[in-house]
Amino acid sequence: MSRRPDLLRGSVVATVAATFLLFIFPPNVESTVEKQALFRFKNRLDDSHNILQSWKPSDSPCVFRGITCDPLSGEVIGISLGNVNLSGTISPSISALTKLSTLSLPSNFISGRIPPEIVNCKNLKVLNLTSNRLSGTIPNLSPLKSLEILDISGNFLNGEFQSWIGNMNQLVSLGLGNNHYEEGIIPESIGGLKKLTWLFLARSNLTGKIPNSIFDLNALDTFDIANNAISDDFPILISRLVNLTKIELFNNSLTGKIPPEIKNLTRLREFDISSNQLSGVLPEELGVLKELRVFHCHENNFTGEFPSGFGDLSHLTSLSIYRNNFSGEFPVNIGRFSPLDTVDISENEFTGPFPRFLCQNKKLQFLLALQNEFSGEIPRSYGECKSLLRLRINNNRLSGQVVEGFWSLPLAKMIDLSDNELTGEVSPQIGLSTELSQLILQNNRFSGKIPRELGRLTNIERIYLSNNNLSGEIPMEVGDLKELSSLHLENNSLTGFIPKELKNCVKLVDLNLAKNFLTGEIPNSLSQIASLNSLDFSGNRLTGEIPASLVKLKLSFIDLSGNQLSGRIPPDLLAVGGSTAFSRNEKLCVDKENAKTNQNLGLSICSGYQNVKRNSSLDGTLLFLALAIVVVVLVSGLFALRYRVVKIRELDSENRDINKADAKWKIASFHQMELDVDEICRLDEDHVIGSGSAGKVYRVDLKKGGGTVAVKWLKRGGGEEGDGTEVSVAEMEILGKIRHRNVLKLYACLVGRGSRYLVFEFMENGNLYQALGNNIKGGLPELDWLKRYKIAVGAAKGIAYLHHDCCPPIIHRDIKSSNILLDGDYESKIADFGVAKVADKGYEWSCVAGTHGYMAPELAYSFKATEKSDVYSFGVVLLELVTGLRPMEDEFGEGKDIVDYVYSQIQQDPRNLQNVLDKQVLSTYIEESMIRVLKMGLLCTTKLPNLRPSMREVVRKLDDADPCVSNSQDTTGKITV
């Protein structure tokens, strides 16, 4: 008891001390709140790459990756996590970070809405959410009075273009472009942002005029309203914005002329007014803009001579003026004092000599001057232009010999001198252009031999030397070109044999050696080029028989006419090329069974004695040999028959318990392939690679090195007489005769015992539907645009073959992305002919085939499927490829499909086409290609069948959309090379 007062006294002292310490050092409640907010923020994100693994509950937020704290208070003031593959959504908990001044999450995959609670971050100065997948309307951010940088461009935001933006008068940078707003005008209130230096409103569905209030933004440095539908005359008031360094007005509907007052913009570095409706003569005053680096005015209606003052500019790097009506001589000094790297002056009416100084500073990479009227020789100075990557000066009137150094461009990917009047030889120096992928020299007057040095161009894909005066033999070194896909040497004076080494060109698709003086036989080794699709040897002096092995190829075109060939025409080749492909070969003949389909076409029927020489001694010898063979065959046959009888008895004894109702297997084999029936029919459920209402697909690895095949087991009845089996086999035989690299190869059909099996070639990369949904390392899509384009072209060619080159034509009736298979090189193959029909059996069926989302609208009220029904379905596939969307998605709305969605998005306005492109693969240099494919998809899905193109037209248009060959601007106004 005596100790209690002391204890009490000690307790009081401790309490007082603790209170004092709490007063001096209060607990960091703020830090706890911030940490909780940050972890709620983290939990709403999908961090598949573990970028936020340093965020640990035991640590201070100040050591978290991407977090910045105030050095004095320790409070969180910044979140910066750009381009780190984050997905998920932004948590409203961000509003608890009241001291936050920077929220920067650009270039991720974040979706959902911008949380309106963000306005509670009153100290926010930087809000950067550009290049994500945010959707919904923009919340009213005007309470953020301190905001200086607002960039939410490059998302999927919608709704109206908000006028409250004009109340944020501290803004220095404003980026709202590349979103999906409703059509609207630029609000006048933007003129109140007096501190604004950067304004980005491109692709915002804007219409109407540029409000005059914008021309009061005296601090403005960058003005970008490209890719809208802004109309009216070019604004003369823009000359008041003397601090401008960049003007982007491309792809609008501006009219009128460029005013001479443009000279006031003395700081201007980039000026892009391309793809409008501007006209008149460009003012000479443009030549006084000494800081100009980029000038693009392509795709307008400008006329007259191009301003000579551009020749005095010393900083100009990019000049793009194609598709106008400029005339006269091109200013001689352009490039003399400036470091040009890109020049496109194509599709004008320039005359006179070709400009001399475009590569004066040895930095020119892209030179496109096609389709003008330039004449004379190519200036010798270009022989030293080793920086060139892409050269296209075709379709002019250039003449004379090409300077030697011009052939050796070590970095060039493409050289196109076609459709001129150039002479001389193709120099052996061409072998030094080792990066070349396309050499296009057709329609000139080149002579001499094809240089052997072409064999050094190991990256070459296309060689076009047709319609010249070339002579000599085709060099065997061409066989070293492993990447070659097209070789056109037609209409020259080439002699000698077709080189056997061509078999080594394993990617060759298109081979044309027509109209030369080639002799000898067609090499049997050509059948080893599995990719070969088009073969033209017409108009030569070839002899011998047509190699039967050529039927192994997946040819869609063949022409051997006008030679001296003899012997039997393989029926499969006759089916591909028709009799005209073999005409003017007097010694060629067709089998009797093929004669009916080739009546009156000048082909004789093969005789069994056609090749026997008629001298008596040989006849006697042959007769003796024939009798000897008959005797041997008879004796052998007797032994074989006896052996077979014994074996049959043994088998009958072994199998006497087998159900007598089991039918024998009927095997229809369409390719030379060793198949074991038991191996095909003993399917393992572990190897199922696909299934549907019609049956299952199995992967089967054949023994004896037979490779891998896909076996489709079809559900069906018991196979009784009259159940349709005979018809099915007949149709399978038609499909089995198809020979096209873009149609899945059917090896065999097995029917019997109540089952039916189809044996197909195996496709390593599955189907297009799956591939479009796959991502690879880094979150990138498996299919970039180059792969998607390749798939589109291949599939189109396959369907075109079915429609136009098969006899009778075949209507697929179920074209869809899951029926387009992909091999190891992403070559597409049309597959699944379960509902396909040959056209000559009638166009009307008792039920509608096809898949919802792909079916043409006319099939809703008619069973008359036609080729145009397939075209519609293929159009849906094209829309899948360019948008990355599925045919049916919830976001389209009830009862809506991808066709409805795309049409509603562009609102019949072609200037909004970019809004529906898949941003995962979209880039400046392939945008034009994507838009062309999109337009073809829209044309194919036109409601009226008669307005849809044929598949041949589709193929032709898709060829024009090649992203690797485009010679013009993309629709963003950026140059496409």
Curated annotation (Swiss-Prot):
Keywords attached to this entry: ATP-binding, Cell membrane, Glycoprotein, Kinase, Leucine-rich repeat, Membrane, Nucleotide-binding, Phosphoprotein, Receptor, Repeat, Serine/threonine-protein kinase, Signal, Transferase, Transmembrane, Transmembrane helix
Residues with Phosphotyrosine modification: 801, 854, 861
Cytoplasmic side: 642-977
Reaction(s) catalysed by this chain's protein: L-tyrosyl-[protein] + ATP = O-phospho-L-tyrosyl-[protein] + ADP + H(+)
UniProt EC number: 2.7.10.1
Superkingdom of origin organism: Eukaryota
Lineage start: Eukaryota, Viridiplantae, Streptophyta, Embryophyta, Tracheophyta
Pfam families membership: LRR_1, LRR_8, LRRNT_2, Pkinase
The name this protein goes by in its record: Receptor protein-tyrosine kinase CEPR2
Assembly and binders: Interacts with the root-derived peptide CEP1. Binds to the ammonium transporter AMT1-1.
Main location: membrane
Recorded phenotype for the gene knockout or disruption: The double mutant cepr1 cepr2 is insensitive to CEP1 in a root growth regulation and exhibit pleiotropic phenotype characterized by pale-green leaves and enhanced lateral root elongation. At adult stage, smaller rosette leaves and shorter floral stems, accompanied by anthocyanin accumulation. Down-regulation of genes involved in N uptake and assimilation pathways (e.g. NRT1.1, NRT2.1 and NRT3.1) leading to impaired nitrate uptake activity. Altered systemic induction of genes involved in N uptake and assimilation pathways in N-depletion conditions. Increased resistance to osmotic stress (e.g.
InterPro entries membership: Kinase-like_dom_sf, Leu-rich_rpt, LRR_dom_sf, LRR_N_plant-typ, Plant_LRR-RLKs, Prot_kinase_dom, Ser/Thr_kinase_AS
